[in-house]
Every structure is written in structure tokens, then in C-alpha cells.
């Protein structure tokens, strides 16, 4: 039995972000403004390979898996992927990050298959601005998808907003009004510099500190984080059903509480969103007989995890855009 995943800085890893495709049907300005373009001839992880990845990480103490992309729900076998991961009772939380365009139609069957949490990208509450940011006129469809999630029994929906200067930072009041009577955790994510997005970053990056100051002045309180939570600082207010999260990767000590690893859609273990090439796992995903070797490679790979990212130096590693490793 391999012990709980722990790195050289005594950080324990309970959370896996598993990308299952690079393909996305949206053209978000900060990620894929020119649309999805295949990189090389790699095939994405198969259902049996995904099952084995899930088993290995569960045996190593992982409690939470988040399915990412690209747009993960574009896979035809997406519901089956949920089912095979949920076969493993050690995985307590199975989440998805989605652009939401298929939620209205499919959220009920995803929940039935075992999905326990959902994050939806929603960078604007204005339909025209939403269209301009995403390249898709699907604002109302995504909104109906969020309503559908509540209708089938999700008690909370997380909504991701990539914070952009003079685009949506000026809409904080509208966002707060939206969550006043809805159990939505609204998560403002600082725009991060990637290989393809340097100019976008310089033009639109703004610190989440501005929102944090406003929240604290208005009586919001910081909540305690659990060991499998993501990196958001989450705030609550007695007058609001919803919550506000801030993800601020440029803040000092952001990496100190890192609890998550990433596996890309082609089967590489990435120790950091902004790390290097990744550690190949796919040669150990052909058979369950390789499970012990797979776990040992994952464990051994953690020796190379750095204490922090180097975004402050403008080093985004090999990440050309966030669809490649899964944000």
C-alpha cells in the first residue's frame, strides 16, 4: 500500500483535476479566441484508462476528482466516465467544470450517474457581453442549465467568472444581486498569463484584492477551507444565500496550501498548472496489472513538485492556454 500523496514541502494531495478532452465549442477571449485547434495526433484517454487513473489516485488518498477540458461534456461517453469513476467508493466528490451548454438537457442523467458537484463558467450576466466573450450566443441556454441543476437536486452550483478589467469587474453589484436569493458560489478568478495570452493579460488583468476589500467592507466573512477544497478564498454573508469565492494566484503564499494534481487528456501527470512537460502515465494504463507501478510513478513524480509557480516572473511554463491541461 502506497501512503497518502505528500510532496517535499509536506503538502498532502486529496484532489485530482482530470482533463478528458482538449476540445471546446466556445471561443473565450482569454482561452481559445480562435477556437479549438488540435495539437498533434494524440488520442484522449479512453474509458478503461480513466477508470485506472481514478483507481490509482483513490488508492493514494484522493477524495475528490474534477473532470475538466476543454469542454468535458463534449465527450459522447461523458456519462459513462462519471459512472466508472463513481464505482470507486473512496472518491467522495466527483465534480465537473463546464461551459454549461449541455446542462439543461443532460444534468439529470449526470447526477443519476454519480456527479456530485458542478461548476459553470459565466463571465457576464449581460447576454450580449457573454456572446462577445465566449463567441457563442448561449447565455439563456446556460442560465436554464443552472436552473436545471437546482431542479434535479444540486444544493449548490459554483459559477466561475474570469475577472477582466473594465469588462466584468464593474458588474460586481449585479453579480451580488444575482446570488442574494440563490445558493450559488460565485468565484472570481484572476486572469492568468499563459503562453498564448500575454497581450490579453497585460490589457485585462486586475487583482481580486479590489473585490475582497469591497466584500469585507460590506460585512462578508471568510470561511474555513476543507482539505479537499480548491484554492478559493470563500466569503459568506448572513443576508445572502450565495457565497463569493476569490481565486488569486498572484497573491503571496497562494501555493502554500496546494492540495491538487492534474492529469491531462493524453495521460500526463502535471504537478502544477504552470509546470513543465508532465510525467507520462499512459504506458501504465493498459492493464490493471500495472496499477502498483502506476501508483509508484505518481508518488515518485511528486519529488519534482516545486514549492511555488513562477507567474510573478512571467513564467507560465508550457501552458499555451487553459484548455490544454484543464485550467
From Swiss-Prot:
Pathway: Cofactor biosynthesis; molybdopterin biosynthesis. InterPro entries: Aldolase_TIM, Elp3/MiaA/NifB-like_rSAM, MoaA, MoaA_NifB_PqqE_Fe-S-bd_CS, MoaA_twitch, MoCo_biosynth_MoaA/MoaC, rSAM. One of its GO terms (molecular function) is 4 iron, 4 sulfur cluster binding. It catalyses: GTP + AH2 + S-adenosyl-L-methionine = (8S)-3',8-cyclo-7,8-dihydroguanosine 5'-triphosphate + 5'-deoxyadenosine + L-methionine + A + H(+). Its cofactor is [4Fe-4S] cluster. Residues 8-232 form the Radical SAM core domain. Binds 2 [4Fe-4S] clusters. Binds 1 [4Fe-4S] cluster coordinated with 3 cysteines and an exchangeable S-adenosyl-L-methionine and 1 [4Fe-4S] cluster coordinated with 3 cysteines and the GTP-derived substrate. Signal peptide: none annotated. CDD domains: Radical_SAM, Twitch_MoaA. PROSITE patterns: MOAA_NIFB_PQQE, RADICAL_SAM. Its EC number is 4.1.99.22. The keyword Ion transport does not apply. Belongs to the radical SAM superfamily. MoaA family. Catalyzes the cyclization of GTP to (8S)-3',8-cyclo-7,8-dihydroguanosine 5'-triphosphate. This is GTP 3',8-cyclase.
